[in-house]
């Protein structure tokens, strides 16, 4: 997929995402999105217990700066990765870190992805991806309320004997 063989931090600095789009994908930001979700699907094929950072590609895309998150190419790529995750019985991470760090107001994955996931599986876990103690449970109540609004009735909670469902 990569013309240059470089790896890019697509979730931290806008200039890195821009370089990835321009240098490796000839300016086609949605091709980057498709490559990202293809890699998410490859990870899902490995059957991880939790599939995290599902749509991290959107982290620094506030207000559609690089691509349209509602574009059919975006949604098709995301849905293909979701189908792979469902087939492999992954628990999807709902991650509050981008909101905590001020990159976005919403969480990962997007509402649209979470609606589709509810139909396919519905197994989610809320995480903070905390890098400091203040972030440990940041946004959990809001994320739980959002999930409930989207139709979820439970989340998975990791206990000493594995995951257990917890009512919202």
Where would I find each of the regions flagged by the language model?
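Extended substrate/RNA-proximal surfaces in nucleic-acid metabolism proteins
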Residues: 1-87
